[in-house]
């Protein structure tokens, strides 16, 4: 079968739910349906509430919006914006997909890196974006993160990272998979310098990102209801031939089993991060 004729299977991480496209109502106000309480929420209200429904459901958030929520006003300085993926394997359709995603998102890659002040604390930050190829990790993402941790180690700064990912970017093959070890090695050097690394796991944090730097943090937080895991629940059920428990891979389930340190609602994250950063100063 020709590669170009390959039919991509439906990806549950990419359709519906937390980042589905808002529906335009007759009066012209876009609305988003909450998968939890099933209410139709005006998009303007949802944006004003930092993409959190009144029932507590956390929708996915764009990287730029998250930085505005967490950063002290005017403090964020972006780094490595010129680092972007190309098509090292000549994968059919990859160039066109990158061009389309960049045009739609106004971003160059699936992660934004830089320096910032959070509650007055100077640190480095990276924020992954589900709206850029589901935050998939390719060679450019790995390069940006590696550079960020090396810079943080040089400047003796803590790193705060917000993860969201469907895993390694298949269009880059082994080059994407090797970023797991590459970034984790940079995290280790940063840790060996006695510096703090805090991760905030958002929905979904899966695949190679979970198996590497997402779970390397000294302190690991997670947003309510976020999916955190390696393989998908359906794959696990089909492989083990066993039914999975309720809430499997949800942040609360992961917390109960000791893989994260705390659940942090979006409106409380800046205060908590400030307290943790100040404890380390």
Question: Model-flagged regions — what are they?
Answer:
Residues 1-107, 115-118, 276-281:
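Intrinsically disordered, low-complexity segments enriched in small/flexible residues
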Residues 98, 127-136:
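Short, basic, glycine/proline-bearing loop/turn elements
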């Amino acid at each position: 079968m020709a590669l170009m004729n390959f039919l991509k299977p439906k990806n549950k991480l990419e359709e519906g739910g937390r980042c589905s496209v808002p529906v335009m109502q007759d009066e012209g106000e876009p609305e988003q349906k909450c998968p939890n309480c099933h209410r139709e929420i005006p998009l303007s209200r949802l944006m004003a509430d930092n993409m959190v429904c009144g029932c507590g459901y956390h929708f996915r958030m764009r990287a730029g919006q998250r930085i505005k929520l967490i950063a002290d006003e005017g403090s964020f300085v972006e780094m490595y914006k010129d680092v972007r993926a190309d098509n090292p394997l000549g994968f059919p359709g990859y160039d066109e997909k990158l061009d389309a995603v960049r045009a739609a998102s106004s971003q160059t890659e699936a992660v934004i890196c830089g320096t910032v002040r959070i509650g007055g604390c100077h640190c480095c930050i990276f924020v992954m974006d589900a709206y850029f190829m589901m935050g998939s990790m390719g060679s450019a993402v790995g390069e940006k993160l590696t550079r960020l941790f090396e810079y943080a180690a040089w400047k003796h700064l803590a790193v705060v990272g917000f993860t969201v990912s469907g895993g390694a970017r298949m269009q880059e093959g082994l080059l994407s998979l090797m970023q797991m070890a590459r970034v984790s090695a940079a995290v280790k050097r940063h840790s060996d310098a006695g510096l703090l690394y805090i991760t905030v796991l958002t929905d979904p944090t899966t695949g190679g990102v979970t198996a590497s730097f997402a779970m390397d943090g000294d302190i690991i937080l997670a947003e309510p209801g976020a999916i955190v895991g390696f393989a998908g629940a359906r794959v696990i059920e089909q492989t083990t031939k066993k039914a999975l428990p309720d809430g499997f891979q949800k942040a609360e389930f992961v917390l109960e089993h000791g893989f994260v340190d705390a659940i942090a609602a979006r409106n409380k994250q800046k205060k908590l991060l400030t307290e943790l950063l100040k404890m380390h100063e």
